[in-house]
UniProtKB/Swiss-Prot annotation:
Pathway: Carbohydrate biosynthesis; D-glycero-D-manno-heptose 7-phosphate biosynthesis; D-glycero-alpha-D-manno-heptose 7-phosphate and D-glycero-beta-D-manno-heptose 7-phosphate from sedoheptulose 7-phosphate: step 1/1. The lineage of its organism: Archaea, Methanobacteriati, Thermoplasmatota, Thermoplasmata, Thermoplasmatales. It comes from Thermoplasma volcanium (strain ATCC 51530 / DSM 4299 / JCM 9571 / NBRC 15438 / GSS1). This is Probable phosphoheptose isomerase. Its cofactor is Zn(2+). CDD domains: SIS_GmhA.
């Protein structure tokens, strides 16, 4: 490959990156800040009533679940008490036992039966909105009397129809949806921190 071809390839890649950055910015701008503030207040009300936050998802969304919980049980933007939050994605023994003995489709709903109480706040994360185990988890959470939030992308999928609240990211690209989910999670944590 000649020098001119290398420069053309570098220019092409930089244009791809520029488009990617703009798509990410557009996705983050699709987040309704008033809705984020309401969700943060609702979670604070759950905490103040003795409830907890429970979060789950698959793959990158599982990582987002754990990140959300870490910001609350640990530290986000200021010193405050640890807040009661748990991710259903961290207990490998439970995940594999439930998947083996029952089905991966019920890996979250089964754990919710054990840990969720009426009034808890349950968040299911799925970039497609159609992960069967996330749908079933949110359905079970509602049956148990929990408040429910779907974090998704695209058109929202099934979880947006199941949950009481939904954050739907305006993108078709999984990685951009995931990045916007983390931005939304950080915004929610910022609202929560403002109450403590």
């Amino acid at each position: 490959m000649g020098r001119k071809d290398k420069y053309a390839l570098i220019h092409y890649k930089l244009m791809d990156l520029s488009d990617y950055i703009e798509a990410g910015n557009k996705a983050r701008r699709s987040i309704d800040l008033n809705h984020i503030e309401k969700i943060g207040r609702d979670i604070v009300n759950v905490f103040n009533s003795g409830g907890k936050l429970i979060v789950f998802g698959n793959g990158g969304s599982a990582a987002d679940s754990q990140h959300f919980v870490a910001e609350l049980s640990g530290h986000f933007s200021k010193e405050r008490k640890a807040l009661p939050a748990m991710a259903l994605t961290v207990n490998t023994s439970a995940l594999t036992a439930i998947s083996n003995d029952y089905s991966y489709d019920v890996v979250f709903s089964r754990q919710l039966e054990a840990f969720a109480k009426p009034g808890d706040y349950v968040v299911g994360i799925s970039t497609s909105g159609n992960s069967v185990n996330v749908v079933k988890g949110l359905e079970r959470a509602k049956e148990l009397g929990c408040k429910t939030l779907a974090m998704t992308g695209r058109s929202g999928g099934k979880i947006a129809k199941v949950a009481e609240e939904a954050i739907m990211i305006d993108s078709e690209v999984t990685s951009i949806i995931q990045e916007a989910h983390i931005a939304a999670i950080h915004m929610i944590c910022s609202v929560i921190d403002s109450y403590y």
